[in-house]
Every structure is written in structure tokens, then in C-alpha cells.
């Protein structure tokens, strides 16, 4: 009797109704939980502010261009305490990456896409490095997203411990790897191009999903978030973007004469070279590019491009004309016409912001950018904290050069700013 009564009560209309509401509520809650951002993608866990607790530098003021705070940075860098601060060595990274879970958590890498838009637009990176493991870690962390792909080329002249440290970092991520073939990179020689080509081949074979390739060196740093980079790349609509201008006459000596590496340095042999095997004239540019996957495939497979590259191997600084020239060959995917009307300067292209000493000056009087706040090496500015405010208002994706040994706070403040900006998207 009691069992029959309970059965009638349980399966009566009101009870069945409330039971169904409960089940549907639980299902809805579960679905919402699945599509929520994981718990670790929280602002508190991934924010980088306060990573250097021993310093009282206010990065917000630095980024605003506050003269007093920037002067404070300069004084801090000169202190004995700062100069004797603990530094991470390759051996430290080898030890840290022996426990990948701990390393990723400690270094606050982002291991989930921050948006659907970013997840659906993977980017490939070629990173050429030879020293300063902490710089590589900071760069990789700043650009790392699980949907992207990262090839790291390590100079064969690098110390064994450095290579081991890079391999340790790469081992902690399924989408980060060391190039399958490594070169001994000599300044201004073909080996710099070959390093990027090696990564191009590996990345092209690794995945057909990535949309664009961006090449970097170990002293680059982003000045845009991953989402901002994705949106700028989408606006290109398949076109490549890199510096490509008419070849100035003073640079013609670089490819009209034959060069070879002698005792680790590139030397002019004085031998006159044959003209390039190309109808398109040679164009001047830089080592840095933002190119589509279709461009990469064409470069790797096209016979005409292969002949051009073979011809260029004994020239001076081929990276500063090769990519710029390929970008003006008509049949290359995403290329520009050879007419000078389509020339792009380094300030018009988005690939890289670089300050050259001989162009610095008063912007109000026609200079392209203000004086360097850091130091100069080979006429290139190694940025200081005072360079950030102006730089962040430019359209470029990356800037070169940064160095933890010149101005750590320039990198730290930029790093904090980009991470906070990226995490802000989670609130909307």
C-alpha cells in the first residue's frame, strides 16, 4: 500500500513537472560551466603587475610618459642593488622546465585561448635566437597562445646550456619546438635567411591551420596583444605586409659583388656577380616580415624563387632585400605591384618598429620619431622606458630592440601593460 501511494505521489503531474524543471536546470548549468573560461584564466592569477616586488617603479606612470617616473627608472638601473639582482641562467631554466606544470604556472603562461576570435585565427612564429634566455622566455610568454605555432632557431654557436634551456622550454608546450635544422648564423650573411627558411619549412609541414607567419629575433617584443595582432592581420585580407622600397644606389654594392664568410665574418671578395635571375628589380627592405601561409608555400616550392635564393647566397645582408623583392613579384600570393607607388617604408609597414639613430630627432620638425631613451648598438636604439609612450601609439605589431641588460623596466612595464589589456577582454 505504502509503495503504491509513493509511486502515485512521485509520478503525479506537479511532481513530474518540478522534476523536469530540476533536470533541465542541471543540464543548463552544466553546459554553461563547460563553455565558461577555465578557473585559471582569472585576472588575479595571470596579471604580471608586482612580478618585481623589490622595485617601486610605477609602470602606469611610465607608460603615460611621466618624466619624473622615467627619471626614477634611470636612477634605479644605476643602483648597486639593481645591478646585483638575482638573474636566471640557462641552468635555472633547465631545472625549472623539468617540471612543466610548475614552470607554466610560475611563469604565468596563458594556456587557453582568450577568445573564440583568437582561437579561430592561429599565427605561426619563427624566432631566431642565440643568447639571453630570460629575454626569450619573456618574449615567448608575451606572444604565447595555445592555438599558435612557434619555431625557435638556436644558433649552433650558442652554449650547450642555452640550447638545452630552449629545448626545456619548448618541451613544456606541444606547439613550441626547436627547428629541425640549425645554422651557424653570421651577421649580414645568408645564414640569417636560412635560419628563417628552416623554421618556415618546419612550420609549413607542421600545420595547415595557421594564417600568417611573423618572424622575430630574441630582442623583439610585441606592442600589441594577440587579439589586436589577429584583427590587424584579418584587415590585410591575405596580403603580406613588410618594408619594400626602391633600392637606393648605395646599397647596390651589397649584391653586385660576391661575399664570403672568412674567419666568422662576411668579407667582400671584390668579384663581380652576375645580375639576379629575375625580371623584377631588386627592392630594399628589412629582415622582418608578416606573410600569409600561401606566400610561405610559394617561397618554399616555386622554382623561380629557388633560383633567386641560390643567387643571393653570396651577397651582403640578403635578408634586407630578399623578402622585399619577393613581395613585388606579380605571381606571389599577397604581393604588391612593382610600381614605386606601392612602396612601403618601415614606418608604413606593420612588421616592426625600429629607431635608427640617424633618423631620430624632433618629430615636430620632421623627424620620424623622437630620440632614443636607451642606448644605441650599430645605430639601432635599444629601447628605454621613456620610449614606450610614443611607441604604443604606433600601428606596428612588434618593436626592436629590447634588452634586459639595458632597461629591464621597459620590458617589464610593456609586459604588464599587454597582459592586463589582454585579460580585460575576459570581463566583456
Curated annotation (Swiss-Prot):
Pathway: Protein modification; protein glycosylation; Glycolipid biosynthesis. Highly expressed in activated T-lymphocytes and myeloid cells. The active site is at 320 (nucleophile). Residues 1-9 are cytoplasmic. It is a single-pass type II membrane protein. It is an enzyme of class 2 (transferase). A glycoprotein binds at residues 243, 251, 254, 320, 341, 358. It comes from the Eukaryota. Residues 33-428 are lumenal. It catalyses: a 3-O-[beta-D-galactosyl-(1->3)-N-acetyl-alpha-D-galactosaminyl]-L-seryl-[protein] + UDP-N-acetyl-alpha-D-glucosamine = 3-O-{beta-D-galactosyl-(1->3)-[N-acetyl-beta-D-glucosaminyl-(1->6)]-N-acetyl-alpha-D-galactosaminyl}-L-seryl-[protein] + UDP + H(+); a 3-O-[beta-D-galactosyl-(1->3)-N-acetyl-alpha-D-galactosaminyl]-L-threonyl-[protein] + UDP-N-acetyl-alpha-D-glucosamine = a 3-O-{beta-D-galactosyl-(1->3)-[N-acetyl-beta-D-glucosaminyl-(1->6)]-N-acetyl-alpha-D-galactosaminyl}-L-threonyl-[protein] + UDP + H(+); a globoside GalGb4Cer + UDP-N-acetyl-alpha-D-glucosamine = a globoside GlcNAc-(beta1->6)-GalGb4Cer + UDP + H(+); a ganglioside GA1 + UDP-N-acetyl-alpha-D-glucosamine = a ganglioside beta-D-GlcNAc-(1->6)-GA1 + UDP + H(+). Residues 5-9 are annotated as: Mediates interaction with GOLPH3 and is necessary and sufficient for localization to the Golgi. One of its GO terms (biological process) is leukocyte tethering or rolling. PANTHER family: BETA-1,3-GALACTOSYL-O-GLYCOSYL-GLYCOPROTEIN BETA-1,6-N-ACETYLGLUCOSAMINYLTRANSFERASE, GLYCOSYLTRANSFERASE 14 FAMILY MEMBER. This is Beta-1,3-galactosyl-O-glycosyl-glycoprotein beta-1,6-N-acetylglucosaminyltransferase.
Amino acid at each position: 500500500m505504502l509503495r503504491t501511494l509513493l509511486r502515485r505521489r512521485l509520478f503525479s503531474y506537479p511532481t513530474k513537472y518540478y522534476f523536469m524543471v530540476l533536470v533541465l536546470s542541471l543540464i543548463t548549468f552544466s553546459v554553461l560551466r563547460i563553455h565558461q573560461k577555465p578557473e585559471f584564466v582569472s585576472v588575479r592569477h595571470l596579471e604580471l603587475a608586482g612580478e618585481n616586488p623589490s622595485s617601486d617603479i610605477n609602470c602606469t606612470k611610465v607608460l603615460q610618459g611621466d618624466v619624473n617616473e622615467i627619471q626614477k627608472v634611470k636612477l634605479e638601473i644605476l643602483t648597486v642593488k639593481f645591478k646585483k639582482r638575482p638573474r636566471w641562467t640557462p641552468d635555472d631554466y633547465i631545472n625549472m622546465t623539468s617540471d612543466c606544470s610548475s614552470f607554466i604556472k610560475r611563469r604565468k603562461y596563458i594556456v587557453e585561448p582568450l577568445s573564440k576570435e583568437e582561437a579561430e585565427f592561429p599565427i605561426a612564429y619563427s624566432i631566431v635566437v642565440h643568447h639571453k634566455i630570460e629575454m626569450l622566455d619573456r618574449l615567448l610568454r608575451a606572444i604565447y597562445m595555445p592555438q599558435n605555432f612557434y619555431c625557435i632557431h638556436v644558433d649552433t654557436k650558442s652554449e650547450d646550456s642555452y640550447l638545452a634551456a630552449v629545448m626545456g622550454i619548448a618541451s613544456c608546450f606541444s606547439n613550441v619546438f626547436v627547428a629541425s635544422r640549425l645554422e651557424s648564423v653570421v651577421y649580414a650573411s645568408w645564414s640569417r635567411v636560412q635560419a628563417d627558411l628552416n623554421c618556415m619549412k618546419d612550420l609549413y609541414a607542421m600545420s595547415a591551420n595557421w594564417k600568417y607567419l611573423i618572424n622575430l629575433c630574441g630582442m623583439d617584443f610585441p606592442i600589441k596583444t594577440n587579439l589586436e595582432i589577429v584583427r590587424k592581420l584579418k584587415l590585410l585580407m591575405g596580403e603580406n605586409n613588410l618594408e619594400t622600397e626602391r633600392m637606393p644606389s648605395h646599397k647596390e654594392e651589397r649584391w653586385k659583388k660576391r661575399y664570403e664568410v672568412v674567419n666568422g665574418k662576411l668579407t667582400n671578395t671584390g668579384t663581380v656577380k652576375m645580375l639576379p635571375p629575375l625580371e623584377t628589380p631588386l627592392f630594399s627592405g628589412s629582415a622582418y616580415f608578416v606573410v600569409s601561409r600561401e606566400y610561405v608555400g610559394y617561397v618554399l616550392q616555386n622554382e623561380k624563387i629557388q633560383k633567386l635564393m641560390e643567387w643571393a647566397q653570396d651577397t651582403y645582408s640578403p635578408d634586407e632585400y630578399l623578402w622585399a623583392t619577393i613581395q613585388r613579384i606579380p605571381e606571389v600570393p599577397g604581393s604588391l605591384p612593382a610600381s614605386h607607388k606601392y612602396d612601403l617604408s618601415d614606418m608604413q609597414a606593420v612588421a616592426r618598429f625600429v629607431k635608427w639613430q640617424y633618423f631620430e630627432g624632433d618629430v615636430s620638425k620632421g623627424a620620424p620619431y623622437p630620440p632614443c631613451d636607451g642606448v644605441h648598438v650599430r645605430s639601432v636604439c635599444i629601447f628605454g622606458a621613456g620610449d614606450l609612450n610614443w611607441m604604443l601609439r604606433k600601428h606596428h605589431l612588434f618593436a626592436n630592440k629590447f634588452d634586459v641588460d639595458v632597461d629591464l623596466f621597459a620590458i617589464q612595464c610593456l609586459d604588464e601593460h599587454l597582459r592586463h589589456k589582454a585579460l580585460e577582454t575576459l570581463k566583456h
